[in-house]
From Swiss-Prot:
The gene is ymgN. Induction: Identified when cells are grown in rich medium (at protein level). It comes from Escherichia coli (strain K12). This is Protein YmgN. This gene is entirely within the pliB gene on the other strand.
Length: 19
């Protein structure tokens, strides 16, 4: 399942934005 990868990508982007 690529859900894990997608979730990590979203979390990484959120952190990068300062969230």
């Amino acid at each position: 399942m690529a859900f894990s990868e997608l979730n990590i990508d979203i979390l990484t982007r959120s952190k990068a934005r300062g969230g």
